Amino acid sequence: ADITFMALHGSIGENGKLQATFDNLGIKYTGPNSLGCTLSMNKLVTKQIFKTSGVPTPRGTSLTVKTKDTRLDELGYYLPLVVKPCSNGSSIGVYICHTEEDYYDAIHKSFDIDNTDEVVIEPFIKGREFACGILAGKALPLVEIVPKDGLFDYANKYQAGGASEICPPVSLDAETQELIQRAGERAFEALRMDVYSRADFIVSDADGEFYCLEMNALPGMTAASLLPKAAKAAGYEYSELCEAIIQESMKARY
């Protein structure tokens, strides 16, 4: 085969190890390179890179098994908070915590997922969620995500009807949409990505500021996925999107 189409998600597909193995074996593949995947999989590293690259992102800190019971006031964080594994995908193990009981329960649950050894906490930002697909370094139209159950979790991502998705958004002015798209492109470049990926943003209800939450190295490509919706709004049929990904990957790998 000329190239392998990467359609994996979570740690096995997005942490860069498979990409590095393919590089060593001389196997061509679609999607971002191993470095971009490795950097984006670690949520704390991603935050640090975003901050130095001028990409707005919520502050955050990590906890290990040894520090997981540290009091919140000692950490300088206050409820409500988001708790999530430092390295995982598909929103698995993400919890919104409004009470201390919720928080400590979420911490312990997060450490139980796939032998997680590090968990990230960050302030919970109430707001509207937007996905910014990036293809060949250029932002696609934004997709607004309105989860039916309040959180765009694993079930809502992969279940038909789990969320309403509006592309392009009608609730956000054109200027802010463009600012988010440019921030998505900066995030893509800062993480040394190539070919395609998807940056997830939230616009705060409190002050209207936007924040990049994370970068998805291999965004979903199912019928219910966000990247194909954004690409369609940009004029790509599904087959054309796949062809564009293959062509960009061939350029990057050869």
Language-model segments: residues:
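Active-site "cap" helix and flanking loop/linker of ATP-utilizing ligase/carboxylase catalytic domains
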Residues: E144-S197, K229-Y254
